[in-house]
Structure formats: C-alpha cells, structure tokens
Amino acid sequence: ASALSLAGAQYSTMGGSECTVLLKNAGSLFNSMFYTEYNAKDSDGNQFVEYDLYFVNSSKKAVKLVGGATQFTVQPDGTSVYCVVDSSLYTVSAFNPKKPELVESNVYAFGADEGFKNVYLTDIYGNVRLKKDGASKLSDIILMNISHSAMMNNGTLLCIGLYDNGGTLCSIKGTESKILDENVYYFEVYGDVAAYYKKAGSKDGLYDVYMSEDGENFTLCVEQAAIG
C-alpha cells in the first residue's frame, strides 16, 4: 500500500487508467480524510486500483472508514464519503464508521455535483441514471453503453461510449443528454475545464485537442499533438 495521502473536501478519484482528481483546500491535517491506494485484480485477472480511507480526528486518532473502494468522493463537510465497494455505492460517516448506508446497488462508477443534489450512477452494463437528492427512485436510463464518465465542477457529466479506435462523447445535465462529437479517442476533466483528443488525419499517434469550460462548447486548441 502507498503512504497515506490527504483527501480534502470534494476530493474525488477513481482507480484504473482513467483518474479524475478534484482537490480543494483541505485546511487542517486533523479532522481530515486520508487514503492509501494499492493494486488489485478481479477474478478475470484484470488489474485495477483500490483505496482504503481513514479519518484522522482532532485527537490524532485514525479511524478506518472504508476498505477496498474502487472510487470515492469526500462530501463537502469533509467528514463523510461516497464510495463504490463491491459494485455498490455507500455513504460512510466518520462519526459512525461501522454503519455504512447503502445508496444503490449495481454501481460501477458515479459522478456527483458539488452539493450532492444530483448523483449520476453508471451500472456494470454501462447504463447511466440520475439519483436526485431525496428521490426514492432512479431516473430512467439517460445513456447506454458508457465506458468512462467524469463530472465537471459546474455539474455537467461527460461520458464516452464503448469503443476501440474512437467513441461518442456526450454530456449530461439533469436527465438530458447531448452528443458532442464522434470518433473521440479519449477525454479528461480538470475541474472547471474539459479536454478531448481526436485522431488527426491518417497518421498514428497524432491528435487534435479540443477544450471547453462548460463541458458543451468545445474549441480546437492544439492540432496534431503527439500522444505517446
């Protein structure tokens, strides 16, 4: 396992090749979340990253909250966390760590807006649904066959479908989805900014880079960038 790393309020990360990090001011080292990460394998031999989360209180005592999470997001209060463990989404409080609350089962990944009013759930089949705060049921399926998604700070969820050499990039706001571009190689979210890469012409390894501050209107910023 790695050394303990600080995870402040609204810190979010997911293991694997796609990793999104949203780190805000963590404040004191006490009354804060920390995590370790380590490599794991599923029954088919696929390698991925898992996380153990701890809360260090003002008395300098470390309490383990979660073991074996594949994705987590620290809630704005900095004392509770949303996490995916064994394909289910839980919320765990530092003040009651032995009683995690099940939010939803059959969850591969999730994205939540800053106030956790809207939580987008992707199941193990790649279907995306919305769980609104206080709602007893999930929305209907918004998008299908999604392989990767990431949330922007403005509450826009970006998604890409299953692909080999290029997929369809879409955005979701509420229960409405919008196709942004086709044949997209990959995309990343950096908090307030998103970028995606699209193959440039017939040459291998060269991509045009498009960027956006709202997750819907993208502008070509770099042509024929070499990505190794």
Specify the residue positions occupied by each region the protein language model found.
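Sequence signature of WD/YWTD-type beta-propeller architectures
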Residues: 1-228
